[in-house]
Amino acid sequence: MAFDKKLLDIVACPVCKGKLEYNKQDNQLICKFDKIAYPINDGIPVLLENKAEPLAE
């Protein structure tokens, strides 16, 4: 199942409440402010802080 980009208008980073960006290559939602990535499983974003991965610098 593909990620629906319309969700970007309504989802926010659970840590800072900021906007998220979609990374199609890695299938993740990125918070540039907190420098973390949230996985997307079967088209569903997993917006749990304990599931987020730090971004590579």
Curated annotation (Swiss-Prot):
Organism domain of life: Bacteria
A Pfam family: Trm112p
InterPro entries (UniProt xref): Trm112-like
Cellular component annotations (GO), alphabetically ordered: cytosol
Homology family: Belongs to the UPF0434 family.
Annotated protein name in UniProt: UPF0434 protein swp_2279
